[in-house]
C-alpha cells in the first residue's frame, strides 16, 4: 500500500534542492512561459542530457511539455525574488521580468544566474501526476556565485560544514 500524501510531502520537505527557473517561448504567442523548479538534474554526459519534472495540473504544463527548446537558469543566492515570482501562478505574476536570450538556442534565460543552459527537448515521459522533460544541452555557461537552495519550504544558501 502506498504511503500517505502527508508523509510523502514531508519527505519532499526533508530534501534540499538547487532552485532553477525553466522557461520557453509559447508557440502561439511567443510569450515567455517559465516556472521555478527544484527538480532539475544532470542526466547524462554522452550525450549531455538534463531533466526536470513538471506537474500536469500547472498552467505552464502544456507549453513546457510541447516546446521544442527550453532554457534552464540555476539561480544564485541573491535571486530569491525571481524564484518567488516564477513560483506564483501565471495569472498572479504581474510585473515583467527581464530575460537574456540564449546564444545558440533561442530560449529565455535569467540574467546573472549561477548557470544558464540552452536545451533542445529530447523526450517527455509521463509518470504519475508529472511529466519528466529531458533536454539535450546545446550550450551552457557558468557565471559563478553561490547557489539558491530550497529546503523545508524555505529558500536559503549553502554553508560548508568546515565554515561552522
Where are each of the predicted segments found?
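Basic, polyanion-binding surface patches
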Residues: 1-164
Amino acid at each position: 500500500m502506498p504511503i500517505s500524501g502527508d508523509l510523502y510531502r514531508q519527505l519532499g520537505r526533508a530534501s534540499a534542492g538547487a532552485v532553477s527557473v525553466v522557461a520557453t517561448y509559447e508557440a502561439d504567442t511567443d510569450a515567455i512561459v517559465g516556472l521555478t523548479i527544484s527538480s532539475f538534474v544532470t542526466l547524462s554526459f554522452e550525450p549531455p542530457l538534463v531533466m526536470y519534472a513538471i506537474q500536469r495540473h500547472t498552467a505552464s504544463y502544456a507549453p513546457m511539455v510541447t516546446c521544442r527548446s527550453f532554457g534552464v537558469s540555476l539561480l544564485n543566492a541573491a535571486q530569491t525574488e525571481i524564484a518567488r515570482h516564477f513560483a506564483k501562478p501565471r495569472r498572479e505574476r504581474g510585473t515583467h521580468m527581464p530575460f537574456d536570450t540564449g546564444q545558440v538556442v533561442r530560449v529565455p534565460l535569467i540574467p546573472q544566474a549561477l548557470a544558464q543552459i540552452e536545451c533542445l527537448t529530447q523526450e517527455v515521459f509521463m509518470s504519475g501526476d508529472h511529466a519528466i522533460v529531458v533536454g539535450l544541452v546545446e550550450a551552457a555557461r557558468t557565471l559563478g556565485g553561490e547557489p539558491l537552495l530550497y529546503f523545508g519550504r524555505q529558500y536559503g544558501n549553502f554553508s560548508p560544514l568546515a565554515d561552522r
